[in-house]
Amino acid sequence: MSTTVRPDEVSAILRKHLAGFESEADVYDVGTVLQVGDGIARIYGLSKVAAGELLEFPDNVMGMALNLEEDNVGAVMFGKSTAVKEGDTVKRTGILASIPVGEAMLGRVINPLGEPIDGKGPIETSIRLPLERKAPGVIFRKSVNQPLQTGLKAIDAMIPIGRGQRELIIGDRQTGKTAVAIDTIINQKGKDVFCIYVAIGQKGSTIAQVVSTLEKYGAMEYTTVIASSASDPAPMQFIAPYAGAAIGEFFRDTGRHALVIYDDLSKQAVAYRQLSLLLRRPPGREAYPGDVFYLHSRLLERAAKITDDLETAKKMNDLPEPLKPMVKAGGSLTALPVIETQAGDVSAYIPTNVISITDGQIFLEPNLFNAGQRPAINVGISVSRVGGSAQIKAMKKITGTLRLDLAQFRELEAFSKFGSDLDKATKAQLDRGARLVEILKQDQYVPMAVEKQVAIIFAGTQGVLDQLDLQYIRRFEEEFLSLLEHKHSDILNSIAETGQMDVDVAKRLKEVAEQFMSTFKQKVTA
C-alpha cells in the first residue's frame, strides 16, 4: 500500500528543522606569517589591524602589532617564538594591550601581561586598564605640594621628593640605586602610599632577593612587583614599565597615592633598540631609534598630582570606561626611574634624555660608595626641582645652610690636602663638614621617620657635635634619638604633627642635645 505525502506536511517538517538552524558565523581577521625570527614576525594580511593591537599566534603565543607597512605587518611576540613558523595563521584580537588592576594586585609578583608568577593562584579582579594611555592634561594637574618621605636623611633633607614628582636615580652599577628605591618603599608603611616595583632585565635571583626583602619588612602588603627578567623576551622588557604605570594610575585616578619605581629604564631602552633594529626602523645616535625620547617621555608624564576638584577630575582626558564611576580627586602617582651610567658618563644619550624629562635627579657616585658613604649621593649635582615646595617647614628651616656647608666642605677638603697649616676658621668648617657627612650616613633597610631626621640634623647644624670624635657620631645618633623617643617624645610629636619647629621647640631640642652631649662625652672618654 503506497502512502502519499502531502506537500504541506513536507513544508511543515522542513520549517521545523530550519527553525533550530543558526546561521551565525564567527568572523576573524587573519593573516599569514611570512617570516619569523628573534621574537619578530612579518605577517601578510591583517589590513585593518591597529598599532599596539594584540595578536594571537598558534600555541597561545600572544604578540603585538608595532609596524604597519604597505604590504605586511611587523609584530613582536611575548612568548616563545620557536613555536611559531612560516605559514602559520595569525588572528586579530581587536583589543589593545591591557593589564588587570586593583587592590587584588597588592602583595603579588606578576609578569608585564598581568599573569601571576608567584605561585599564589589567580588574581581576582575584573578591572583592566590599557598599558598605553595619554598623560593627564595641564588642566587636570596640580603643582606638587605634599612630601613623599624616603626615610633617607640625605634625600629628605637636601633633595626632597613630593607626591606626583618624577625624580631620577642615576649612577654606575653597584652604587646603591636599587637600595635607595627599596628603602623608599619600606618607608611608605602606614602612609597610605601604594607601591609598584618594576624590575626590567634584571637577574631572576636579584628580583627574588628584592621580593624577600620587601616581605621581610612587611612592605609586600602594599606593593606589587612586576618582573621582567633578563631571560624574558625583549618585548616583555619593553612593555613592563607601561604595565607598572597602568597599575599606579588606578590608584592615582581613584584619589589615592602611588609610587612606581622603574628599575631600570636603561635596560628598557636597550630592549626597545633591539626590537626597532629587528623591525628595520632607521637607527639614530648610539643605534637607538628616533623615538627613544618619546619612549620615556610618554611613560614619565603619566606621573602627576591630580587636581582636588572632583568635577574637573571626572573630565580627565583618555579616562578608560571601567574607571569612570570610580574617579576621585586629589590622587597622585610619583615615579622614581633608575638609569645606569657607564663610568659616570651622565652625558650619554639615554641619561641626558631622562634627566631632561624628570623633575630632578639623585646622582650616586662610586668614589663616595667606595669611601664608605652610604647612600653614596653626590649632593653637588643632585637636585630636586619641585620637591622644595613639598618639604615640611621644619626640615626646610634646618637644612637651609646644609647643602652650602657640605659644598664648601668638599671644596676645602680638596685644598686642605695640599697644606697642613690651616687657620682656625677653616679647620672649624672642615670639622663641621666631616660631622655633617657622618650624620647623613645611613644603613640599608633602616629608613628614619622625618621628625627624627630633623632632630639629628638640627644637632649637627647647631654645632652640638663639633667637639665629638667622628667614630662616636653614629652611636651618639642612636642614643640621642632613643632618649628623645622615650623621655622627650612631645618634641618629636610636635614636629611630626605640625611639620614645623617653632622657637620654643628649637630651644628645648638644643638644650636636650647639649645636656645629652655632656653626659655622652663623659661616658665615651671614661
UniProtKB/Swiss-Prot annotation:
Annotated site location: Required for activity: 382
Signal peptide region: none
The reaction(s) this protein catalyses: ATP + H2O + 4 H(+)(in) = ADP + phosphate + 5 H(+)(out)
Membrane topology per record: Peripheral membrane protein
GO MF, one annotated term: ATP binding
Localization: Cell inner membrane
Family matches, as InterPro entries: ATP_synth_asu-like_sf (IPR023366), ATP_synth_asu_C (IPR000793), ATP_synth_asu_C_sf (IPR038376), ATP_synth_F1_a_nt-bd_dom (IPR033732), ATP_synth_F1_asu (IPR005294), ATPase_a/bsu_AS (IPR020003), ATPase_F1/V1/A1_a/bsu_N (IPR004100), ATPase_F1/V1/A1_a/bsu_N_sf (IPR036121)
Assigned keywords, A-Z: ATP synthesis, ATP-binding, Cell inner membrane, Cell membrane, CF(1), Hydrogen ion transport, Ion transport, Membrane, Nucleotide-binding, Translocase, Transport
EC number(s) reported in the record: 7.1.2.2
Recorded GO CC terms: plasma membrane; proton-transporting ATP synthase complex
Residues engaged in binding ATP: 171-178
Assigned protein family: Belongs to the ATPase alpha/beta chains family.
Assembly and binders: F-type ATPases have 2 components, CF(1) - the catalytic core - and CF(0) - the membrane proton channel. CF(1) has five subunits: alpha(3), beta(3), gamma(1), delta(1), epsilon(1). CF(0) has four main subunits: a, b, b' and c.
Cited function: Produces ATP from ADP in the presence of a proton gradient across the membrane. The alpha chain is a regulatory subunit.
Protein's recorded name: ATP synthase subunit alpha
Gene: atpA
